[in-house]
A protein has these predicted regions:
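Residue-identity detector for glycine
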Residues: 14, 34, 38-40, 77, ...
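Short, low-complexity N-terminal intrinsically disordered segments enriched in polar/charged residues
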Residues: 1-41, 45-50, 61, 66-68, ...
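Compositionally biased, intrinsically disordered low-complexity regions enriched in proline and serine
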Residues: 32-33, 57, 113, 126
Length: 142
């Protein structure tokens, strides 16, 4: 039995609802598809105002860097079309865990790999944390 299965059958808790699973997948789709389509409204729906998006990587000179992006920067970047050049890519979504109003999702495209944490708010599921890296063969050093 995996940790996820144990969490799903813990006393007083049941498996995640199909509605929650669908809503989490829709949130992640809004995040990526909003980015690729230049749709700031979809991005705004997907990210929590307190979003902490980070990437730990190396710049062109191999200097370690920490890149941080806010919810406003993601929304404005999407609306400005910053992700359109990478549109049409595949999107793989794997929900790793759901419980107690939080979820963990592994998502990837041809260009990005993200570890996402979501919270269930009165407005629905939203991404509160995102740790990302470039997919193999992409990014500034590709």
């Amino acid at each position: 039995m995996t940790v996820i299965e144990e969490a799903w059958v813990a006393p007083m808790a049941g498996p995640p609802s199909q509605d929650d699973i669908a809503a989490i997948e829709a949130c992640v789709r809004d995040y990526y598809e909003g980015w690729f389509a230049g749709d700031g409204e979809r991005m705004a729906r997907a990210v929590h105002p307190a979003l902490a998006k980070r990437a730990f990587a190396q710049d062109r000179d191999r200097t370690p860097t920490l890149d941080e992006t806010s919810a406003d920067e993601m929304i404005d970047g999407a609306a400005a079309g910053a992700g359109r050049a990478r549109a049409g890519t595949r999107l793989d979504i794997r929900i790793a865990e759901i419980g107690g109003g939080i979820a963990s999702v592994n998502a990837s495209t041809d260009h990005y790999v993200d570890l996402l944490h979501l919270i269930k708010t009165p407005d629905g599921w939203q991404i509160i944390n995102a740790l990302w890296r470039w997919a193999d063969g992409h990014g500034p050093r590709a």
